[in-house]
Amino acid sequence: MKCRPATSADIPEMTRIITEGFLDYPFHIMLKPYLYQPERYPQCLKAVNRMLVRAYLRCRNALVVEHEGRVVAVALMHDRKVGFWDNFINGGHELFRYATPMLVLQFDEVAARSDQVAIDLGDFDWYLEVLSVDRHMRGKGVGRWLVAKVLPDFVAKRGGRAYGFVTSTESNARFYTNGGCELLDLVEVRLREQTCPIWAFQRRAELLDS
């Protein structure tokens, strides 16, 4: 098993892994009732994730884990937030097939407020936007290896102090706590009439033993 920088050839598998991993994610499910056609929520989520993968591949840091020649996990990291236009030109415009511009803007604002919880309370200079493991590899230590070993080393080698992130599921929160991450806060966010919890975390940078 190895972690490497993603390439454009990885985009389809990265998009699939993230979409499958986040299909039932409470934060994203808040979108569903307000889409033009709620039954097209999976396609909308795929468009969101394809946009993120393309934007991070082009502008920031996109990593994949390979096992036996297959991509089995994805991590998207940044030390400077990806801007609106970077997202737009990398597929953000596709979201308007599924949602009004107002809904897209509101969802983006809620995401920014969620991230800001970690930013305000943490002491980190890198941010983990997405972490997702292929469903066939869950429970085999891939996520823990990334969170506790690979990503702290990645940040440390770039002179960083720590990385921050948020999650909206209790099971993820337990996973991160057990993986040595520091819980910063638990809050609730709202998109129109929908709400979900947000756990904010940070993890200190640490070089792997050579």
Regions flagged by a language model, labelled:
Residues 2-29:
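A short beta-loop-alpha structural element at the N-terminal edge
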Residues 43-64, 127:
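A short helix-loop-beta-strand connector motif used in the catalytic cores of GNAT acetyltransferases and
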Residues 59-75:
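Conserved beta-hairpin
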Residues 76-132, 190-195:
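Conserved acyl-donor/pantetheine-binding loop and adjacent beta-alpha core of acyl/acetyltransferases
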Residues 124-126, 154-168:
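Conserved GNAT acetyl-CoA-binding A-motif
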Residues 129-138, 164-174, 191-194:
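Conserved beta-strand-loop-alpha-helix junction that forms the acyl-donor binding cleft
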Residues 133, 139-153:
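Conserved acetyl-CoA-binding loop-helix of GNAT-fold acetyltransferases
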